[in-house]
Amino acid sequence: MKRLACLVCSGTAALTAHAEFDANRLWVNAGFYSAHFDTDQGLRNANPGIGFEYRIDDTWSATAGRFRNSNNANSNYVGAYYQPWTWAGVKLGVVAGAFNGYPNAYEGGWFPALIPTASLEGQHWGLNMALVPPLKDRLYGAVSFQLKYRFR
């Protein structure tokens, strides 16, 4: 955990050194709503939380946050969106990062993830959509939706 925190701080410092912070690029993200593929598992669909997403350019953004996951445990995440394609105004790509807090996945510890994503962004409101693949008996798959807001 300490190593991950150091990595995030180092990345943030490098970003700050590269470009000046622009508040217009910062999104505040709510938790998630997850439509699970396995509806009979008693999973929590509403996953409240808070996160932040900083749009570095039209293709890249950095993200981190905390939410109550589908197993009713607290989870943290950190990652980077790479969305090089746009179709009908929707950004398409992946988010690569790490999650923790899932009791059946790596004993609740941190694990890597690569998740297909689509994002729709307006002037103030946006929506991230993710296709979370199932991971055997460790993580249940879902289509997840994350509402976001930008103060401009």
Task: Go through the PLM ranges and name each one.
Residues A30, I50-Y54, A64, V78-Q83, ...:
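Residues on the lipid-exposed face of transmembrane beta-strands in outer-membrane beta-barrel proteins
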Residues L26, D58-A62, A88-V90, L120-M129:
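Repeated loop/turn-to-beta-strand initiation elements of outer-membrane beta-barrel proteins
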Residues W27, F32-A35, Y140-R152:
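Outer-membrane beta-barrel "beta-signal"
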Residues L15, A19-E20, I56-D58, Y81-W87, ...:
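Outer-membrane beta-barrel proteins
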Residues F37-N45, F67-N76, T86, N100-F111, ...:
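Solvent-exposed loop/turn segments connecting transmembrane beta-strands
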Residues M1-A23:
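Cleavable N-terminal export/targeting peptides
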Residues H18-R66, N76:
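Short glycine/proline- and aromatic-enriched beta-strand/turn motifs that initiate or cap beta-hairpins
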Residues A30-S34, A64-R66, V94-A98, M129-P133:
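Transmembrane beta-barrel strands of outer-membrane/channel proteins
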